[in-house]
Amino acid sequence: MASAEGVRDLLGLLAYAELVAFFRLSEDAALAPSLSDKAALGGMAVAEFGHFQLLRDEIARMGVPPEQAMLPFVGPLDDFHARTTPSDWLEGLVKAYVGDGIAADFYRAIAELLDPPTRQLVLDVLADTGHADFVTSRVRAAIDADPAVAGRLALWARRLVGEALAQAHRVAAERAPLARLLAGAVSSPDGPGGEQGEIGRMFARLTDAHDERMAALGLAGWERVPEAEAPGPG
């Protein structure tokens, strides 16, 4: 069973991530090219804030001030977003899809170790708000209209994966209770490399789902194609 400290760290991390997602989607909504897109993203932002409120309330129920639980993760998450500022609306959409997808896989793996009510809370918070379908349809439409953007977006997605995993390693290295929880989600910490070795293997497996997301976006196979030379797939 997960330790109380590990659960607190997980919920604090997820709560701050949901709060940041609310801010990010609100910004994306302001940049959206049409009123319907603005409204759709605005609705998704509201859903993310609702997720944050659920987590905040659960942390408070545990007897921990929510701000105290979130504070250790402000630096790593803010650093990730500072290092991956999108240059346009499409890059913002890809960032949300790729980054949120890796994070969701990460949280779902850990949720298996939680008590049933907390596990269900995490899964409810991770439920798709319609953002995945929204992003894939817009990115695919943009590629159909201008195939040259595919190479740029694919390289951007690859960079996002590297940055996301680097910050996840940082969090695991700095927060021992969370590191033990992560190690328990994949194997025994007695294996080669101890807890950090198990965590590294977990992160390696998380990249497998990235290939599926790239295919869903229509970006599979584009990472090595310079934008100026990209005539279109096939």
Can you describe what each PLM-predicted range is?
Residues 1-12, 73-96:
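Acidic/His metal-coordination segments adjacent to aromatic residues that form catalytic metal sites
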Residues 1-35:
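Basic/polar, acidic-poor N-terminal "presequence/leader" segments
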Residues 5-13, 35-50, 89-93, 117-131, ...:
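Alpha-helical scaffold segments that form or flank carboxylate-/histidine-based iron centers
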Residues 21-42, 84, 100-117:
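Helix-loop segments that flank and shape redox-cofactor active sites
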Residues 44-71, 137-139:
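Conserved alpha-helical segments that form or flank metal/cofactor-binding pockets of metalloenzymes
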Residues 93-103, 210-213:
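Extended alpha-helical coiled-coil scaffold domains characteristic of the BAR superfamily
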Residues 108-169:
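A contiguous pocket-lining binding segment that forms or flanks enzyme active sites
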Residues 148-234:
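Extended, helix-rich structural scaffolds rather than catalytic motifs
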